[in-house]
């Protein structure tokens, strides 16, 4: 088949992407992976195939755009296109994290609460990941607007996060390592989508030592640099439940070093109106000793789901999206970006250059794109 034919074929695969009409059983997600024509590492797609419509988010070395295929007849079909400049990735020592992100997302397709990697590709200067677009925006925005969530909203979103952690840990041995409201989007139906797998890593039952994450959500063992594993995600879930109900994380200060001190001390202070079951699950999830932490042992997600805080959750109904999302975003059309912040245009001045020397050393590491 000629290169042009491959190009047209891969564009058609991208155009054909549809969310499954209903969530798959977690085991089918894994079993059917090889049958899927998603997560393709394309040698034929190019940035010139897309129209970049609006910036959805920015980071230190990446920018996410709302994008559309130029020759697509369905004008409502849009995607989130993550663009990472190779030179910036190298300068900021993020090569391993970027590779882990693509590897992790490629292993996961059709999970109801995880963003879908449709395709990846690269060119001389940049790496690209084409993802599904979640028009609801960050759950962070809704939390700040409401100041705090009520107990039922907090419970449902915590349950969806719990099932996501369960899947990553028990099926793939992946530690997500960056759980926070900014990395949780809402789809049009008000259900979560976990995004940004830049710190995700397959650790299984081993320990890793990379210091990564956001200060308020770091587990004590990460701060101690004593080796950490899957248990860090259960700690972060406890922090999130607290933040959903109270409006701010339990450990916070203007000075990050003071945040670290508070986390290591581990003294949780609960407002008097916080429900007892919520206080208890946060206390169990935020044990400073990871071996004592709820969810720590193999299959420990079952113990998390069995906690009284989740007593009213119908787990299958929630997973298969038979339960209505507690917050329904205002979305007027499929390409609506009204739930996202405005971002300035990217500054192309003083950009790092992907030199021939860098290319010789690092290009083999980007081959999976």
Predicted segments, located by residue:
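Intrinsically disordered, low-complexity regulatory segments that flank or precede the catalytic domain
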Residues: 1-44
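Protein kinase glycine-rich loop
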Residues: 53-64
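Glycine-rich ATP phosphate-binding loop
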Residues: 63-86
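A conserved loop-to-beta-strand element in the N-lobe of protein kinase catalytic cores
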Residues: 115, 124-132, 140-141
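Activation-segment/catalytic-loop signature of the eukaryotic protein kinase fold
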Residues: 120
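Activation segment signature within eukaryotic-like protein kinase domains
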Residues: 157-158
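Eukaryotic Ser/Thr kinase distal regulatory-tail detector
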Residues: 278, 319-369
């Amino acid at each position: 088949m000629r290169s042009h034919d491959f190009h047209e074929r891969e564009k058609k695969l991208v155009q054909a992407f549809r969310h499954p009409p209903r969530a798959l059983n977690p085991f089918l997600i894994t079993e059917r992976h090889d049958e899927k024509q998603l997560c393709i590492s394309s040698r034929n797609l190019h940035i010139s195939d897309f129209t970049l419509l609006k910036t959805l988010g920015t980071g230190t070395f990446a920018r996410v755009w709302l994008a559309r295929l130029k020759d697509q007849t369905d004008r409502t079909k849009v995607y989130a296109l993550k663009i990472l400049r190779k030179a910036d990735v190298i300068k900021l020592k993020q090569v391993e994290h970027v590779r882990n992100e693509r590897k992790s997302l490629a292993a996961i397709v059709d999970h109801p609460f995880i963003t879908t990697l449709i395709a990846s590709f690269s060119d001389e200067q940049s790496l690209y990941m084409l993802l599904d677009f979640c028009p609801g925006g960050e759950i962070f925005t809704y939390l700040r607007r409401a100041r705090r969530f009520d107990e039922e909203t907090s419970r449902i979103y915590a349950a969806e996060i719990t099932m996501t952690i369960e899947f990553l840990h028990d099926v793939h041995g992946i530690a997500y390592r960056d759980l926070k409201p900014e990395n949780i989007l809402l789809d049009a139906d008000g259900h979560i989508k976990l995004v940004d797998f830049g710190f995700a890593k397959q650790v299984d039952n081993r320990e890793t030592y990379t210091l990564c994450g956001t200060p308020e959500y770091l587990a004590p063992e990460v701060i101690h640099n004593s080796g950490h594993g899957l248990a860090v995600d259960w700690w972060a879930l406890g922090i999130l439940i607290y933040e959903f109900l109270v409006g701010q994380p339990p450990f916070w200060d203007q000075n990050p070093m003071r945040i670290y001190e508070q986390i290591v001390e581990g003294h949780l202070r609960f407002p008097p109106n916080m429900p007892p079951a919520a206080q208890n699950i946060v206390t169990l999830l935020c044990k400073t000793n990871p071996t004592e932490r709820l969810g720590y042992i193999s299959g420990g997600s079952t113990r998390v789901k069995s906690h009284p805080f989740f007593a009213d959750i119908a787990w299958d109904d929630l997973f298969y999206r038979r339960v209505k999302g507690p917050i329904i975003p205002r979305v007027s059309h499929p390409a609506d970006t009204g739930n996202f912040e405005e971002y300035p245009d990217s500054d192309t001045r003083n950009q790092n250059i992907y030199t021939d020397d860098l290319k010789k050393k690092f290009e083999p590491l980007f081959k999976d794109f």
